[in-house]
Amino acid sequence: MKRYLLILILTLAFFTLKAQNKNIYMSSGGEIILSGADVNFNGVDVNTNMRFTIFLHVQQQINFNFTDNLGLYTGLSIRNVGLIMEDYYQNVGYDVDNTDINYNKNTKIKHRSYALGFPLAIKVGSFDDNFFAYGGVEYEWMFHYKQKKFIDGDKYKFTAWNSDRVNTWIPSWFVGLQFPGGFNLKFKYYMNDFLNKDFVGQDFGEDVDYSQFESTGIWYISLSVMLKWKTIKREIDENFDNKVAYR
């Protein structure tokens, strides 16, 4: 229901702006993401590592400027999000006791998913100077999952489309600043857990019950460059003209 309401609002906003001949433009960019996580398993605060990712992060935005100082944007994004746990074997998700051969062994587990996002944000600032603050919400579909395990110097991994191990749809809120030149600094917080507490099964042949995860919340800080399509086109045309002239 919420998704249908969002689509309706965006459709109405689009046609209202078209009718009023306001400024509408497209922009594109990527992201460099540094993320962290808050993980608790069976009452234990699990040690987590910071996660640095560059690939694959793509953002396409439709910008609606009501005035020179107030507007909004929506669009689509694809990004790589997840968490890294590094702790004793019994603390990273496995349903084992002290008789297990791996008990008390240092183990690293990486959970990640590619996410398709649908953002909606308000922006306030000086659009003529390309300098503004923004804040909003995003709904992300976790469509491709990967898990890696590192133990005793060995690495194991598997992937799955639409895995039940992560929540399918995760909402988030974010705030950020765009600076002249298109540089962006953003903070995002995911409002739901990353892992699905209803999942019961096996990971790498070991029994797991994700209901034992009391929390698997993630957040991130990102740097990006967002450029208007007309700016990108101008750069391409200028580079092409320079190459032709050089020949």
Language-model region placement:
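Bacterial Sec-dependent N-terminal signal peptides
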Residues: 1-31, 123, 131, 223, ...
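Membrane-proximal, glycine/serine-rich, low-complexity loop/turn segments characteristic
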Residues: 20, 63, 70, 74, ...
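Residues on the lipid-exposed face of transmembrane beta-strands in outer-membrane beta-barrel proteins
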Residues: 30-32, 56-66, 76-78, 116-124, ...
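Extracellular/periplasm-exposed beta-strand and loop segments of Gram-negative cell-envelope proteins
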Residues: 36-52, 81-113, 142-174, 195-201, ...
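Membrane-proximal helix-loop-helix units in multi-pass membrane proteins
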Residues: 124-154
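Predominantly the C-terminal beta-signal and adjacent terminal strand-loop region
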Residues: 161-247
